[in-house]
Structure formats: C-alpha cells, structure tokens
C-alpha cells in the first residue's frame, strides 16, 4: 500500500515547502524507498505556461510536455526521478476537468459543488499518481499558505483523504516559520501556534512540524511547540537556513525527519546511504578558483525565471571544481550601451530562453560580443534563435534578417514558425513541448560533449531555424551539429573557429542533476574556467580546448 505525506505551509509564503518535500524525497530514496512528489497549486490558471515569468518564475517542462511549477524541477533534481503531467495539479485544471464532466453529463443532472465534486477530483488526481507509478511513498505539496481562501478545497480534500485510505497510510507535515525578533532578543512561536490552530479548525492535526529558522532553536522552544501544537517533541524538526539548498537533506537527516516519517507510517527503518550527497555538499563548500558567468536575460528582475539554468550551472561548477559567480544582465541595458561596460571581465556568457521582442537586440549584442571576443558562450532556445539572427546580420550580410516572431514582414525570416503551429490560435499548451530525439554530427563539439549519436532533450518553442537559409549559413562557417532524426529541425548550432560557442533549440537545463551535471553545461563551465586561466596568464584562446565529460 502506497503511503502519503502531505506538506502544508504556514505563517508566510515562499517558506520552502518545495525544498522540504524534495529533501524528504531524497532521504527516503537514500533508504531505497521509491518516491513520487505531487504539487497542488491553488491558482486558477490551468497551468503556468501562459503566466508572466515576473509573477510565476520559471515554467518547468517535463518529459511528457507538461508546463509546470518550478518546484517540480527541485523534485527531479533532488530525487533524480523524472516527473510527469500527473505530478502537477492546479485549481484551474481541477475545475476544467469537473466542468468537462458536467458538460458530458457525467454527473447525471446533479448540482455540481465544491464538496464533493471538486474535492473528489483532487483526491482522484492524488490516487492517479500512486496508481501510475506505484511508489512506496507519494509526497504531496499544497501550494500557498494555510488560511488562503484559494487553498481551502485542497485542504478539505486532504482531510477527507486520511479517512478514505486509512489513518496509518497518511501523514501531515506542516512547514512553518519561527522568527527571531531582534528587539526582543528571542524567537517567537505564536505565529506557528496560530497557523496550526487554523489547520486544526479545518480538521487537520499536523503529525510533524518543520520549523524554518535563521539560528538553532534554543532549549525550551521545541517543548513549547510540542505543548501548544499537540505534536511530540521528536516530531518538531529544526530546519535552519543553509548556505545551499543541497545541504537541506543533510540538515533534516541530522534532525531525524526521515526516521520519524517512517515510524509514523509504520514503514521499515533502513540505513540511509547519503555518502554521494554528502560528498556533493563538501565539494560545493570547498574553496575553488572562480569563474564569472553572465546571464543575459529579459526577466533578470526575478532570477527564479531562470532557476534551472542557475542550478545547471551550479551542478557543472561543482563537477569542474570552480566557484560560480553569476553576473545578471538585463538584455535591454545592452541595446543602447556599450556591451563592454556590462560584459567586460566575464569568463562565459549564457543567453537563455524567452518570448517576445523586448530586449532581443540586447541579447544579439551580447552574442556578438562573446563571438568577437572569443568568450565561451551557451545559447538556450531563444538564445539559439538570436545567434542565428546575429550571424545572418553580421556574417551572412543579411542586414534585415529577423525572426518572424519579432517582425512578421521581414524579407529574411531566418527564424520561422513551425509548420504545425501555422493554424494554432490558442496559446496554452500548444507549443512543441516535451522530450524529442536529436541526432548529433559525429565530428562536432556537441558529440564530443555528449559522447552519443542520438540524444533526448526537452523543448518549449513555436519557432525554428528556417531551412531556406541553411546552405547559406553552412557556406559561411556555421555548423548545424544537431538536428531532428529526419533532418528537418535544427536543434544545435556551433562555431568551430571559436573556443566554445554552442546553442540549442531545446532546454538542456531541465535534465541536469546535482550528481550528474548536464554535459553541455559541464563543457561550458570547463571552457569558462580555461578562459579565466588563459586570461590570468595573458593568453588569448585560439582553439577549442580539450573537454572531458
């Protein structure tokens, strides 16, 4: 029988429920338990695919093409397990499903209500994850904060869930904040008491409290929490702020979280193997030579919009053995200013994905700067499309070249709409999404990094390289090193005369793991480290460095 752990949050939003859920997943997996993690988001959007990055942050894409919350990225990276569209549920998708059933007549003329129809649909989605993958434990994170009106149907559903599947199969974990008040010189438990009181008024009694704090809980705090929240002292878990999110599983292991979860769910206590994770964190904190990577993007005001890119760079830096310093650059700032003022001194440039014309000329300026100054470069999705435009204008002498997305009337649309997108009118969920194969050119940098002929990567785009210009580009030194198996879609481009210049139509960042860095990011960071070393020694790189994978 699958066990279920529900993770709620109290006091403040963005308290770290996703990291706690992902960390618990890692701890259970280290004990050889199979785990799946589900995110219940209370917003009414069907999915985050059409939401502004400034409001939502990154849209994480799964293998099966679901556009999901960024927390699913944490789940995958911590557990090294691929999630699917079943692992992401929103209020909008629940209501959409219920209304579709009502229109079909599935409810036989009954009055459709929050209870039981909405709550039943929520419970069905949870059970579907258990049925699909048959894990030992399903961890369910409920988005938002206890007390939010949007979360009430989810909380009611998980209250009912315990009765329906058996009390011995369900555990409630509440992540809360214990703030330090400097003027009083003490930690305050009252916000947590009120949060737990709110949960109990709904009918949910937490079994475990995970207490976020910026310092150790001093003696007596756990006893007080236990007394006022009706939770055993050993189930009051300290989760102190860490330098890196990857240390959190180790902190929670020391606090005995996994052992307590297994005890409450009547599961066998097994010895964890966290040696690889411990080594990862030790490498992360070890002093190393620095590399400074510029991320030139449109949404840098909210860096969570590029969360998987940041994490993939961190994974690579750990593997390569260097200290990662990120320089965030708003691409709009480069449109009317000298790129040298913003990019001078960096050892690598990343131009990530995005949509729309705003800031595109700044991205193109950054690409030109990296190309001309022999700085290691990595372009992702829109970053690749901007590389194509820059090459067309600067090298192929098509000065008016553009993407049909930015200028539908351009006489040289080097980037064009995918044929299957021509008649699409609805924006949500209609892009080229999910995992697709890509065939690599054998004598290319891409092949040198991947060491495979056919790779699989995740996509999220509507536009592609226009093959009408392919021969012109190839004649000017442009290399298409990766394409769809039928040769129609350009997936990877590179410049062999550059120390490291590669760009992809797909999003490699979604498949990077802390213990298995993505080969493109590892190669890029290694090239950035070489560039930094050469610059320190007064050398100018003139050829592609030898890259180990």
Curated annotation (Swiss-Prot):
It catalyses: UTP + L-glutamine + ATP + H2O = CTP + L-glutamate + ADP + phosphate + 2 H(+); L-glutamine + H2O = L-glutamate + NH4(+); UTP + NH4(+) + ATP = CTP + ADP + phosphate + 2 H(+). The active site is at residues 381, 507, 509. It is an enzyme of class 6 (ligase). ATP binds at residues 14-19, 71. Pfam families: CTP_synth_N, GATase. It comes from the Bacteria. Mg(2+) binds at residues 71, 141. Its EC number is 6.3.4.2. Residues 292-534 form the Glutamine amidotransferase type-1 domain. L-glutamine binds at residues 354, 382-385, 405, 462. InterPro entries: Class_I_gatase-like, CTP_synthase, CTP_synthase_N, GATASE, GATase1_CTP_Synthase, P-loop_NTPase. Allosterically activated by GTP, when glutamine is the substrate; GTP has no effect on the reaction when ammonia is the substrate. The allosteric effector GTP functions by stabilizing the protein conformation that binds the tetrahedral intermediate(s) formed during glutamine hydrolysis. Inhibited by the product CTP, via allosteric rather than competitive inhibition. UTP binds at residues 13, 188-193, 224. Residues 1-267 are annotated as: Amidoligase domain. Pathway: Pyrimidine metabolism; CTP biosynthesis via de novo pathway; CTP from UDP: step 2/2. The keyword Nucleotide-binding applies. The keyword Disulfide bond does not apply. CTP binds at residues 13, 148-150, 188-193, 224. GO terms for biological process: 'de novo' CTP biosynthetic process; pyrimidine nucleobase biosynthetic process. HAMAP family: PyrG. Homotetramer. Catalyzes the ATP-dependent amination of UTP to CTP with either L-glutamine or ammonia as the source of nitrogen. Regulates intracellular CTP levels through interactions with the four ribonucleotide triphosphates. Belongs to the CTP synthase family. CTPSs have evolved a hybrid strategy for distinguishing between UTP and CTP. The overlapping regions of the product feedback inhibitory and substrate sites recognize a common feature in both compounds, the triphosphate moiety. To differentiate isosteric substrate and product pyrimidine rings, an additional pocket far from the expected kinase/ligase catalytic site, specifically recognizes the cytosine and ribose portions of the product inhibitor. This is CTP synthase. It comes from Cyanothece sp. (strain PCC 7425 / ATCC 29141).
């Amino acid at each position: 029988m699958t066990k279920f752990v529900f993770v709620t949050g109290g006091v403040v939003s963005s308290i770290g429920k996703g990291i706690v859920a992902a960390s618990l997943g890692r701890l259970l997996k280290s004990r050889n338990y199979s785990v799946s993690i589900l995110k219940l988001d209370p917003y009414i959007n069907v999915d985050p695919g059409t939401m502004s990055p400034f409001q939502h942050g990154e849209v994480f894409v799964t293998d099966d093409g679901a556009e999901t919350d960024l927390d699913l990225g944490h789940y995958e990276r911590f557990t090294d397990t691929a999630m699917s569209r079943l692992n992401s549920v929103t209020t909008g998708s629940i209501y959409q499903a219920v209304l579709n059933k009502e229109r079909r007549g599935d409810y036989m003329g009954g009055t459709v209500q929050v209870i039981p129809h909405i709550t039943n649909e929520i419970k069905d989605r949870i059970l579907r994850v258990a049925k699909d993958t048959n894990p030992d434990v399903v961890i369910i994170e409920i988005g938002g904060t206890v007390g939010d009106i949007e979360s009430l149907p989810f909380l009611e559903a998980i209250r009912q869930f315990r009765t329906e599947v058996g009390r011995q199969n369900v555990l409630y974990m509440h992540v809360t904040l214990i703030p330090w008040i400097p003027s009083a010189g003490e930690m305050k438990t009252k916000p947590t008491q009120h949060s737990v009181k709110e949960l109990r008024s709904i009918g949910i009694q937490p079994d475990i409290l995970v207490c976020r704090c910026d310092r150790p809980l001093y003696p007596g705090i756990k006893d007080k929490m236990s007394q006022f929240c009706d939770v055993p002292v050993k189930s009051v878990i300290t989760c102190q702020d860490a330098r890196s999110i990857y240390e959190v599983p180790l902190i929670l292991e020391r606090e005995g979280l996994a052992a307590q979860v297994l005890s409450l769910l009547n599961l066998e206590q097994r010895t964890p193997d966290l040696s690889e994770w411990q080594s990862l964190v030790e490498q992360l904190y070890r002093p190393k030579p620095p590399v400074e990577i510029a991320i030139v993007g449109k949404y840098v005001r909210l860096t969570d919009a590029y969360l998987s890119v940041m994490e993939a760079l961190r994974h690579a830096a750990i593997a390569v053995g260097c200290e990662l310093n990120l320089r965030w650059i708003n691409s709009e700032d480069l449109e009317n200013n000298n790129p040298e003022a913003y990019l001078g001194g960096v050892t690598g440039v990343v131009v990530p994905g995005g949509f729309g014309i705003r800031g595109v000329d700044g991205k193109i300026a950054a690409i030109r700067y990296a190309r001309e100054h022999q700085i290691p470069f990595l372009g992702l999705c829109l970053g690749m499309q901007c590389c194509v435009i820059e090459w067309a204008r600067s090298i192929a002498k098509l000065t008016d070249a553009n993407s049909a997305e930015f200028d539908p009337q351009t006489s040289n649309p080097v980037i064009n709409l995918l044929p299957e997108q021509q008649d699409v009118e609805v924006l949500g969920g209609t892009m080229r999404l999910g995992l697709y194969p890509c065939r690599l050119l054998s004598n290319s940098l891409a092949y040198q990094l991947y060491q495979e002929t056919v790779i699989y990567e995740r996509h999220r785009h509507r536009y592609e390289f226009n093959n009408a210009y392919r021969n012109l580009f190839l004649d000017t030194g442009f290399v298409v090193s990766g394409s769809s198996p039928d040769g129609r879609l350009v997936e990877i481009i590179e410049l062999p005369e550059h120390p490291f210049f590669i760009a992809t139509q797909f999003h490699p960042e979604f498949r990077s793991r802390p213990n298995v860095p993505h080969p493109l990011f590892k190669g890029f960071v290694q090239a950035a480290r070489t560039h930094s070393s050469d610059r320190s020694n007064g050398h100018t790189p003139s050829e592609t460095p030898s890259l180990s994978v």
